[in-house]
Amino acid sequence: MSSSILNELGWRGLVAQSTDLDALADELRRGPMTVYAGFDPTAPSLHVGHLVPLLVLRRFQRAGHRPIVLAGGATGMIGDPRDIGERTLNEAYTVAEWAERIRGQLERFVEFDDVAKSRNGAIVVNNLEWTSPMSAIEFLRDVGKHFSINLMLDRDTIRRRLNGQGISYTEFSYMLLQANDYAELHQRHGCALQIGGSDQWGNIIAGVRLVRQKLGATVHALTVPLVTAADGAKLGKSTGGGSLWLDPEMTSPYAWYQYFINTSDADVIRYLRWFTFLLPEELVELEQTTVSRPQERAAQRRLATELTVLVHGAAATQAVEHASRALFGQGELARLDEATLATALRETVVAELKPGNPDGIVDLLVASGLSPSRGAARRTIDEGGVLVNNIRIQSEEWTPRTSDFLHGRWLVLRRGKRNIAGIERV
């Protein structure tokens, strides 16, 4: 077993912090390792930021190592301290439900071969399994005794909270719970490497120390960069202040695809390195195309396709690609099934057209928000910039016929090349 996985993580830019990489490389060369990453159910779904550590687990598995994915049923009831203040504690049944949903998502990203026959089939665990039976006395004696307050106060987030609004003992103790997870996984499964986001470094190192002090073993830590755009914005925040969720009911496959196809040239190659398994030569070719022929957006299209297949599957990806092409005039709208068309349009502005409402094209442009006024709508029509169902409208007197409504219900309005809205007949 070679340490080539570390070389791959290096050229992909996926190592933010680590314990001694030479020592880790030596252990990787000695044989398969067991590697873990944990994910707290603080929401009903994982989001795009979780993909980077998840895919690093997958990269380790492809290199012959065994991944453990941990759903934080216990730690999710506490919440990792953050700068903006105390978290609202969720009910136990809510956390349990979210943990089950997230467990199902985690299982899609690693391979579950027969553990009895395979040396690197994935394991999924919930830390509630060992945390729940532990009494307060056991926790303080077996875990808390190994930590000094000075060490815990050294974490940046803790220090900032203490200098501001303060922090509860509940959140202050989160580090100990996560550290104990590492010790438990080392004892149960021989886990010797924890992976997480760079904001988890303090918690992960606490686990490394606990394993050394309590069990006398040397284990390793590696963090990946947090996912941000070139301007420093968190990935997905342009979706209206929320996250890009992996659950298709929270972020539709169409919205997911559109987000990544609109990635900036400054970010797209980095995201391809982080989120895909493309080889170096493929990435070089896409980077060269982005520089020489940026209008083709070849890298963006590849990124959107790869990530949508990864999260939503090939069939959903084919449907959203077809919908995307059709909405922007590069395919036949009539070939879209109604569910796909409706989902795509609901990611835009949809105006309702009720019986008796004005239905002229000028009225529809204003109602949909594509034009700020009737005068602006008329000017856009005169300039040839308005299309309905990809057919250019040449008269401001145009009104839709029954046969114009796709599936008897929908009109697709477009102003210019990229401004789209839907009209739904109700």
From Swiss-Prot:
Its main location: cytoplasm. CDD domains: S4, TyrRS_core. It catalyses: tRNA(Tyr) + L-tyrosine + ATP = L-tyrosyl-tRNA(Tyr) + AMP + diphosphate + H(+). InterPro entries: aa-tRNA-synth_I_CS, aa-tRNA-synth_Ic, Rossmann-like_a/b/a_fold, S4_RNA-bd, S4_RNA-bd_sf, SYY-like_C, Tyr-tRNA-ligase, Tyr-tRNA-ligase_bac-type. A motif ('HIGH' region) lies at residues 41-50. It comes from the Bacteria. It is found in: Cytoplasm. Keywords: Aminoacyl-tRNA synthetase, ATP-binding, Cytoplasm, Ligase, Nucleotide-binding, Protein biosynthesis, RNA-binding. GO terms for cellular component: cytosol. Its EC number is 6.1.1.1. PROSITE patterns: AA_TRNA_LIGASE_I (PS00178), S4 (PS50889). This is Tyrosine--tRNA ligase. The gene is tyrS.
